[in-house]
Design a protein with these regions (language model features):
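Short, well-ordered coil/turn segments that N-cap beta-strands
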Residues: 16-20, 55-56, 90-95, 113-115, ...
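N-terminal amphipathic alpha-helix/helix-capping segment at the start of soluble metabolic enzymes
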Residues: 1-27, 170
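Acidic (Asp/Glu)-rich catalytic clusters
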Residues: 51-52, 110-111, 126-135, 169
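Glycine-rich, proline-tolerant flexible connector loops at the mouths of alpha/beta enzymes
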Residues: 30-32, 56-83, 181, 185-187
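Active-site glycine- and acidic-residue-rich loops that bind
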Residues: 35-41, 118-124, 147-157, 181-199
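Conserved, mostly hydrophobic/aromatic
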Residues: 24, 50, 54, 99, ...
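Alpha-helix-loop-beta-strand connector modules within alpha/beta enzyme cores
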Residues: 70-98, 103-107, 131-141, 156, ...
Length: 211
């Protein structure tokens, strides 16, 4: 029996092991490291540190999505990441994920060498179209569904997005699902998700969990 993989551009990540995703916020206002890595040199140095510490892939974002954030424009988001992205691709040797919900930014990120798109809004039609025109991996986050059992809701959202992705021509092995702990959910729902996360997983697809 073949081991399922997460296919992200030229990278094929077997799903019989766990990978650590290093988070690189090229923003002034992220809750964890806002302002530290606005300089491309500092950002690259941090990415290489995370690789040395065991990261198997790097996620870079130019827009904070902390609770209560104020969205910036696609142009400003791209301005923040455009100089560091090619260096990350060239120097780390790791799959580089770009955290964006803007299709315009996503297209430019792929052209700059990103292997993965990470959309906290769950890949609407325009983002699916961008992804379908490439071989990138797609991290699909549940942005906060409503009504009923939280695990069933999240899994239902994932299955809906799986169907939409496949209709767009995106193969199952290119999909990774993130239950979005802390996004659009109550404290009780977040705890329930963490305790019963196996109920939300989609067979044959990668799964991402924030820590």
């Amino acid at each position: 029996m073949n081991t399922p993989v997460f296919q992200a551009g030229e990278f094929s990540l077997p799903l019989d092991r766990t990978y650590v995703m290093g988070i690189l916020n090229v923003t002034p206002d992220s809750f964890s490291d806002g302002g530290k890595y606005l300089d491309p040199t500092a950002a690259l140095e941090r990415a290489l540190e995370m690789k040395a510490e065991g990261a198997g892939l790097i996620d870079v974002g130019g827009q904070s999505t902390r609770p209560g954030y104020t969205a910036i424009s696609p142009e400003e988001e791209w301005e923040r990441i455009r100089d560091v992205l090619p260096a990350l691709v060239k120097k780390t040797g790791l799959p580089i994920s770009v955290d964006t919900f803007y299709p315009w930014v996503a297209q430019r990120a792929l052209e700059a060498g990103a292997s993965i798109l990470n959309d906290v809004r769950g890949f609407g039609p325009e983002m699916l179209a961008v992804a379908a025109g490439s071989r990138c991996g797609c991290i699909v986050m549940d942005p906060g569904t409503t009504g009923g059992d939280i695990c069933a809701r999240v899994r239902g959202f994932f299955l809906d997005r799986l169907e939409a992705a496949q209709r767009a021509g995106i193969a199952r092995e290119r999909l990774c699902f993130d239950p979005g702990v802390g996004f659009g959910k109550t404290v009780e729902e977040n705890l329930d998700l963490i305790a019963h996360v196996e109920r939300t997983k989609v067979e044959g697809c990668a799964f991402l969990m924030a820590a």
